[in-house]
Amino acid sequence: MTTMSRRYTPNIIITGTPGCGKSSHSSSLVSQLNQTLGKETTIHFKHFNISEIAKERDCIESYDAKLDTSIVDEDKLLDSLEPDLEKGGVVVDWHCCDIFPERLIDLVVVLRTDNSNLFDRLKTRNYNDLKLQENLDCEIMEVILQEAKDSYIPDIVIELRSDTAEEMDENVDRISSWVETWIEDHPDGVSNELNKQYNPDDSSDEGDDNSDSDEYELEEDEQEEEEEREEYDEETNEEMEHTEDIAQ
């Protein structure tokens, strides 16, 4: 069976409207995980603030003057991030989550904030009126939550409140516990690949002399695909069980 790339620590997206506490959650989570898990192992989690990463890796496409914000080249960004995600242990901190492949994401945390709190937080950032109102509307309409549910298996998407420092501490503790359980339950890691289906149109006819060999190879491919499907289903079921625990 062909060896497939695997990751041994989960990738987590912490997303939500600007001002909901993504960076604070992500920084605290990574610090806690590295303190608790890194003492006796080589495990090391990384906080990827995508707004900063996009600038560092030259993934800014343009600038929107009305909203006073940079426009990211998402294709270039994803190409840059994919090798990091395949290694695992990445906590992605960004207001957008739908560009990341489902096969590389294990948990999506959508932070929600009361609009009065959000207004105050964005005001302290000196957001202009248009940008402030757009973000408030985004929170009211649950745009990012719906985006997450549309982009990933619903069972790995959780919604957490982020109005107080106490709630942030509770959220970080819950996510940390989920990570520890995930690592314990995946000693052999998880695959970074999706199941590949055999497509007869991709094969070429090289003559009757190779027909027996081709048939044997196809049987082997089918067996490998079935094993990969079973493995993927098992990993998906485990993810669903773990996410139910953290959402409770």
From Swiss-Prot:
Name of the protein in its database record: Adenylate kinase isoenzyme 6 homolog HBR1
Instruction: Set out the biological process GO terms recorded for this chain's protein.
Output: cellular response to oxidative stress; maturation of SSU-rRNA from tricistronic rRNA transcript (SSU-rRNA, 5.8S rRNA, LSU-rRNA); phenotypic switching; regulation of gene expression
Annotated compartments: Cytoplasm; Nucleus
Any matching Pfam family: AAA_18
Q: What does this protein do?
A: Broad-specificity nucleoside monophosphate (NMP) kinase that catalyzes the reversible transfer of the terminal phosphate group between nucleoside triphosphates and monophosphates. Also has ATPase activity. Involved in the late cytoplasmic maturation steps of the 40S ribosomal particles, specifically 18S rRNA maturation. While NMP activity is not required for ribosome maturation, ATPase activity is. Associates transiently with small ribosomal subunit protein uS11. ATP hydrolysis breaks the interaction with uS11.
Give me the stretches of Basic and acidic residues compositional bias.
Answer: 239-248
* Segments for region (Disordered): 188-248
Q: Which family does it belong to?
A: Belongs to the adenylate kinase family. AK6 subfamily.
Q: Where is this region: NMPbind?
A: 49-72
Q: Which residue stretches belong to region LID?
A: 124-134
Does the keyword section mention rRNA processing? yes
Q: Subunit structure, per the record?
A: Interacts with small ribosomal subunit protein uS11. Not a structural component of 43S pre-ribosomes, but transiently interacts with them by binding to uS11.
Which annotated residues bind ATP? 19, 21-24, 125
Q: Which reaction does it catalyse?
A: AMP + ATP = 2 ADP; ATP + H2O = ADP + phosphate + H(+)
What InterPro entries does the record tag this protein with?
Adenyl_kinase_AK6, P-loop_NTPase
Cross-referenced SUPFAM superfamilies, in alphabetical order? P-loop containing nucleoside triphosphate hydrolases (SSF52540)
Query: Where do Acidic residues bias regions lie?
Result: 202-238
Its EC number(s)? 2.7.4.3
User: Whose protein is this, by species?
Assistant: Candida albicans (strain SC5314 / ATCC MYA-2876) (Yeast)
Print the keywords alphabetically. Answer: ATP-binding, Cytoplasm, Kinase, Nucleotide-binding, Nucleus, Ribosome biogenesis, rRNA processing, Transferase
GO MF: adenylate kinase activity; ATP binding; ATP hydrolysis activity
GO cellular component terms, A-Z: cytoplasm; nucleus
Gene3D superfamilies referenced in this protein's UniProt entry, alphabetically: P-loop containing nucleotide triphosphate hydrolases
Highest taxon of the lineage: Eukaryota
> What does the entry say induces or represses the expression of this protein?
Induced in the presence of exogenous hemoglobin and during the exponential growth phase and by cold-stress.
Judged by the first EC level, this protein's enzyme class is transferase
